[in-house]
Amino acid sequence: MNRLLQRQLFLENLLVGVNSTFHQMQKHSINTCCRSL
């Protein structure tokens, strides 16, 4: 059970990391689009 919990925490952390990275990329692409306009 402890191992399962660790795996769940790891997956949640991974998801949060991917989400934050995606948001940063989105912000960056929006900024570059605004600059090119």
UniProtKB/Swiss-Prot annotation:
GTP-binding as UniProt keyword: no
Subcellular location: Host cytoplasm; Host mitochondrion
GO CC field: host cell mitochondrion
UniProt cross-references to InterPro entries, sorted A to Z: Rotavirus_NSP6
Domain of life of the source: Viruses
Keyword Metal-binding belongs to the record: no
Keywords of this entry: Host cytoplasm, Host mitochondrion
Family from the record: Belongs to the rotavirus A NSP6 family.
Subunit annotation: Interacts with NSP2 and NSP5.
Name listed for the protein in its UniProt record: Non-structural protein 6
Organism field: Rotavirus A (strain RVA/Human/United States/P/1974/G3P1A[8]) (RV-A)
